[in-house]
Amino acid sequence: MSADDGGIRAAQDKERARETPGHGHSCQEMLSESEGTVPLGEAWESPHIKMEPEEPHPEGVSQETRAEGARGWVPLSQGTKEKVCFLPGGALPAPQTPVLSREGRTRDRQMAAALLTAWSQMPVTFEDMALYLSREEWGRLDHTQQSFYREVLQKRSGLSLGFPFSRPFWASQVQGKGEAPGSSRQLGHEEEEKRGVVEVDKEELAASLGALGDAKSFKSRMGRAQGEAPRCGQRAASGQNSGPAKDDVQPCPVKEAQLESAPPDTDLPKTQEGHFPEQPREGGTAAPESSEEGLALDSEAGKKTYKCEQCGKAFSWHSHLVTHRRTHTGEKPYACTDCGKRFGRSSHLIQHQIIHTGEKPYTCPSCWKSFSHHSTLIQHQRIHTGEKPYVCDRCAKRFTRRSDLVTHQGTHTGAKPHKCPICGKCFTQSSALVTHQRTHTGVKPYPCPECGKCFSQRSNLIAHNRTHTGEKPYHCLDCGKSFSHSSHLTAHQRTHRGVRPYSCPLCGKSFSRRSNLHRHEKIHTAGPKALAMLMLGAAGTLAAPPPAPT
């Protein structure tokens, strides 16, 4: 007696058991009605329930395979035919199917029916799910069990019970191998259809899923279950095929399935996911494929076809060109809801809004200074490492920031494209122009949290905060004197080197600081009284002793 006949008999007995009174109760209630609760292991040992022995294993089967078969797990092999059984009545036979003896009493029949009901609610093996699960039993599983078994089926054999299969569909796919209608194979299918059994070959299953348009997901599942199959035109491993070398190239099963199953007027896609075209396109290389749609991209992808009409800069995407044009038109469609500042890009607005929240999640591990942006932290860390990745191509001077390099290159070209519309002053950077325009508007958006003084530039606020903290981070390497501003250190170092870069255009006198030059120029332009006051101030400065180094 085969496992299929035993499963059918169990299904028939289960249908008769449903007609008995009390079948609508749960498994626990049925067992409690018949002499109390019976453990599952003892129930299988009932004298009126006999276990059908398994078929003997063929010769050549390993001990590991036999052990897996004893546990109810049968490994699937490539090239074998698997049976998807839709049994009537929702029966769920296992490798060892309980078969009711004809002399069994009604009580034992009720117990067996209850056990069969409990069987459908118990965790079952992959053998049961893959080969003997009916549609009715599949519908009884909850969402978690369906997801679990669907994942198992996808990993093990590529089968999925989520597709609404129909007998004519499979019959049409199985047929077409050169067999005439009414052949012995078709008659065998009709006999198995009476029992609810449909026999499907794995290769035919691959072709059917490919015809359904699910070749992408099926290929990924079959690749995980049986190892990645060779791609189109790819040679198989030397140990997999013992035939001649000319037969090593394996055709693509998905492409063949599409050619066989598609109508004559259907335009098939040129490429499939994971299947590269055998002949490259124009240009010598195959075009890349889209991972989302499975369609080949345009051969022109990667080229910068969108060109700016004003500056000639080219872009690969039209959206990038639209964003770039805003640098010429000055359009800033993204406005900050807190301060009203506008930006040309939404990413710049997001970065700006962190200033209002005061959040500084990025901390330097060397000095523990915090920053609101990760890019600012990276630029700051170059101060500790001394890294200067940006090099001027004309004078080989290096910079830690790209913006500093752009500013420096303006000294070579002399180009100042950013012009102030009020006074006509030009600048090399747009940020410098924005800072300059605050001198006309009087806007000072950076207030000091200690004294409330406002500044037009953030750098001036940082320097001002040192007057409250007393911090002097700039040290002279010659005398050790410290300063709160880098400009003060630069002017001080000129006293050691004797450099006086500021000269008076009238008398030629030189000075080490620009402020001293401005004071000197008033001597030539001021009246006698102002000149006397300047001379007295200069004499007092010369008579005063130099400040002691700190």
From Swiss-Prot:
Region span, Disordered: 1-67, 174-200, 216-296
Domain KRAB residues, every copy: 124-193
Biased composition (Basic and acidic residues): 11-22, 45-58, 187-200, 267-281
Covalent crosslink: Glycyl lysine isopeptide (Lys-Gly) (interchain with G-Cter in SUMO2): K216
GO BP, sorted A to Z: regulation of transcription by RNA polymerase II
Molecular-function GO term, any one: zinc ion binding
Phosphoserine: residues carrying this PTM: S290
CDD domains according to UniProt: KRAB_A-box (cd07765)
Subcellular location: Nucleus
Principal localisation: nucleus
Keyword tags: DNA-binding, Isopeptide bond, Metal-binding, Nucleus, Phosphoprotein, Repeat, Transcription, Transcription regulation, Ubl conjugation, Zinc, Zinc-finger
Pfam families, per database record: KRAB, zf-C2H2
One cellular component term from this protein's GO annotations in UniProt: nucleus
Gene3D superfamilies: 6.10.140.140, Classic Zinc Finger (3.30.160.60)
Zinc fingers typed C2H2-type, residue spans: 306-328, 334-356, 362-384, 390-412, 418-440, 446-468, 474-496, 502-524
UniProt domain comment: The KRAB domain is required for transcriptional repression.
Functional note: Transcriptional repressor involved in regulating MPV17L expression. By regulating MPV17L expression, contributes to the regulation of genes involved in H(2)O(2) metabolism and the mitochondrial apoptotic cascade.
Family as reported in the entry's similarity comment: Belongs to the krueppel C2H2-type zinc-finger protein family.
Protein name: Transcriptional repressor RHIT
Originating organism: Bos taurus (Bovine)
